[in-house]
Curated annotation (Swiss-Prot):
GO terms for biological process: DNA recombination; regulation of DNA-templated transcription; regulation of translation. Pfam families: Bac_DNA_binding. It comes from Psychromonas ingrahamii (strain DSM 17664 / CCUG 51855 / 37). This protein is one of the two subunits of integration host factor, a specific DNA-binding protein that functions in genetic recombination as well as in transcriptional and translational control. This is Integration host factor subunit beta.
Length: 95
């Protein structure tokens, strides 16, 4: 599902809202979530899951074209951990 698909589905379920209102709401929600993560905050949506940052330590990598060693800096990466209800729902649907 893409962001456009999400907006389309929400608009069809909530016909009293315009496409523009739904689009603005989805964009604002994603912006708020991204800003929270950028500030190091953890986001928890009960029954769905949580978003947090995981630290990746500095390491030595290789340039795929030349094979040369490349020093890679440490960095934070977004991480999603599904909640129990989401895991159970996904497993039930794929059983």
């Amino acid at each position: 599902m893409t962001k456009s698909d999400l907006i389309e589905r929400l608009t069809s379920k909530h016909f009293q809202l315009s496409v523009k209102e739904v689009e603005d709401s989805v964009k604002e929600t994603l912006t708020l979530m991204a800003n929270s993560l950028a500030q190091g905050e953890r986001i928890e949506v009960r029954g769905f899951g949580s978003f947090s940052l995981h630290y990746r330590a500095p390491r030595v990598g290789r340039n795929p074209k030349t094979g040369d060693r490349v020093e890679l800096d440490g960095k934070y990466v977004p991480h999603f951990k599904p909640g129990k209800a989401l895991r159970e729902r996904v497993n039930a649907a794929n059983a």
